[in-house]
UniProtKB/Swiss-Prot annotation:
GO cellular component: plasma membrane
Location within or outside the cell: Membrane
Main location group: membrane
Transmembrane helix as UniProt keyword: yes
Pfam family, one: FAD_binding_8
Source organism of this protein record: Scheffersomyces stipitis (strain ATCC 58785 / CBS 6054 / NBRC 10063 / NRRL Y-11545)
Protein name: Probable metalloreductase AIM14
Gene behind this protein: AIM14
Keyword entries, A-Z: Electron transport, FAD, Flavoprotein, Ion transport, Membrane, NADP, Oxidoreductase, Transmembrane, Transmembrane helix, Transport
Function, as annotated: Probable cell surface metalloreductase. May be involved in iron or copper homeostasis.
PANTHER family named in the record: METALLOREDUCTASE AIM14-RELATED, NADPH OXIDASE
EC number(s) given by UniProt: 1.16.1.-
InterPro entries: FAD-bd_8 (IPR013112), Fe3_Rdtase_TM_dom (IPR013130), Fe_red_NAD-bd_6 (IPR013121), FNR_nucleotide-bd (IPR039261), RBOH/FRE (IPR050369)
Length: 524
């Protein structure tokens, strides 16, 4: 072998490995894994300390809340900065050694997958609520997933550029281990496009199927594609996905004998589920998730659907009552079996033991969230001021209270925002939260419960249920006047559940009034 050929071979190796051993990128993957573990530990520990401080002091600390409620976009930007820094760290002459950075991007993306799966887990009836509300992590899960996919796409584009430059594109693409990566790479732009709000809401089922197929292919195929291998990460990812399947199908309750209560002129209906004997105690405002039986192919293709439990945890309650609208995209067939997971709490236990003045406003099917909280405080021995306001489009919907609030001594303020009562003018409103909660949701859109540009209180009358009924929208200064006037009371709360317009207006009203605010979004 000539000295020229030896020098050429050495130069070739230097170009491939940038002067480092080919395993140099392994440590950067473990750095990402370690940082994600730190993120999880700090998040859970912060929640525990926040709730501990709340229980000990009797009030929710605004400082602790700011610590544990870091906006998802801040966390996403931090992770983006970490990826940007590590991807080029300690790489000299990047233009020549860009393949080292490209390889590193792929490894870092795969090593962040356990984190995004972990924050999407839904542990039911979390003891003491100590880990917080799983839906609080929803936006972070969504954007971290997008960061992973964008990074993986960058990895794929880098190698496509390299192979094209070398004139070996066709040869390299169809090499087995490369082809596994190319297959996943081809799915990712499609999923990102399908995840855009407009597309996702137009066909959530398609998005959900694409999401799961891409995730499983990413976890499994990249385990065989990666060089050097990622056996530990693959085991962690598969274990977390296996836990999700276990919770959904093997820790769920199988339901039969579901009944429906409805009124011919209302678009709302009550679904009554016999309470399973082993169903645990739950806090007011908790929700369950309904799905199809495991023997139904739909159970494996489509998401479960979240519904707030409109009934209370009282021992006399033999059913779990849900409020939903008809028709819905998850129609209930009383002759078919279903599965149920949960309960999942929303507000922490400390709220129920420390709140001293509470007002609740609900829009449409949001009554399923506000009503059990209202009943809890009315029936408790604490005797705190409590008020419930319900905004609906039709007086026909008040039949809900005849079944869920039989106590005739309890007064609920009802605002009817439309005089028509026409069934055709009411839109579907059945479940809770955003559809990103892994459910195909339909909700009270801002055109359903008109909260703006309507005349205020025009007429007042009594029903035989002792509920005060108003025509028009509520004037917040009047409706919540008792809350604002209680200047010497700590732990004043306004709870809003309904469409985004209602929630945004309520949040603005609380500004500068020393009033705690909590909301649940019921929207498609």
């Amino acid at each position: 072998m000539s000295w020229y050929s030896v020098d050429s071979e050495i130069e070739s190796l230097e170009r491939r490995h940038a002067g480092h051993h080919h395993t140099v990128n392994i440590k950067y993957g473990y750095v990402i894994l370690a940082l994600s573990i730190v993120h999880m530990v700090l998040s859970i520990s912060g929640k525990k300390l926040y709730f501990k401080n709340w229980a000990e002091t009797g009030r929710a600390s605004s400082w602790w809340r700011s610590v544990v409620s870091i906006p998802f976009w801040v966390s996403t930007l931090v992770w983006l900065a970490i990826f940007a820094f590590l991807s080029i760290f300690h790489i000299e002459e990047l233009s020549e050694n860009y393949t080292t950075a490209v390889k590193r991007l792929g490894r870092m993306a795969y090593c962040l997958v356990p984190f995004t799966i972990f924050i999407s887990l839904r542990p039911p009836n979390t003891v003491g609520y100590q880990s917080g509300y799983y839906l609080e992590k929803l936006n972070l899960h969504k954007w971290i997933s997008r960061l992973i996919f964008a990074t993986a796409i960058g990895h794929g584009l880098g190698f496509l550029y390299k192979w094209t430059k070398e004139g070996a594109l066709a040869e390299k693409i169809f090499k087995f281990d490369n082809f596994l990566g190319v297959t996943v790479f081809a799915l990712m732009p499609v999923l990102i496009f399908a995840s855009v709000n407009v597309m996702r809401r137009r066909n959530y089922r398609l998005f959900y199927i694409l999401h799961n197929v891409t995730l499983w292919m990413f976890v499994v195929l990249i385990a065989f594609h990666a060089r050097p291998g990622v056996p530990l990460l693959a085991v962690i990812n598969l274990a977390l996905l296996g836990y999700q399947i276990y919770q959904r199908f093997f820790k769920s309750y199988y339901l039969h004998d579901i009944s429906v209560v409805e009124s011919p002129y209302s678009k709302m209906q009550i679904i009554r589920i016999p309470r399973p004997e082993t169903f645990p105690s739950y806090l007011p405002g908790s929700h369950i998730r309904l799905g199809y039986s495991a023997t139904n192919i739909s159970a494996w293709l489509y998401a479960t659907h979240p519904f707030t439990i409109a009934s209370t945890n009282d021992d006399s309650e033999s059913t779990l009552d849900l409020v939903m609208n008809k028709p819905v995209n998850f129609p209930i067939d009383i002759t078919s079996p279903y599965t149920m997971t949960g309960p999942f709490p929303s507000l922490p236990p400390q709220f129920y033991t420390t709140a001293r003045h509470v007002n609740i406003i609900c829009g449409g099917s949001g009554i399923s969230f506000g009503l059990p909280i209202y009943k809890y405080f009315v029936n408790s021995n604490r005797s705190i001021p409590i008020r419930l306001i319900w905004c609906i489009r039709s007086s026909d919907d008040t039949f809900i209270l005849d079944h869920l609030l039989p106590e005739r001594s309890i007064d609920v303020q009802i605002y009817i925002t439309s005089n028509t009562g026409s069934l055709n003018q009411q839109q579907s409103a059945s479940t809770i939260f955003d559809e990103e909660a892994d459910a195909l949701l339909e909700g009270d859109s801002t055109t359903n419960i008109e909260m703006a540009n309507l005349a205020t209180d025009k007429e007042e009358k009594k029903t035989d249920h002792f509920n005060t009924i108003h025509d028009g929208r509520p004037n917040f200064d009047d409706a919540f006047g008792n809350l604002a006037a209680a200047v010497d009371v700590d732990e004043k709360w306004l709870i809003a559940c309904g469409p985004r317009k209602l929630i945004d207006d309520c949040r603005k009203w609380t500004k500068g009034k020393d009033i705690e605010f909590y909301s649940e979004l019921y929207e498609m």
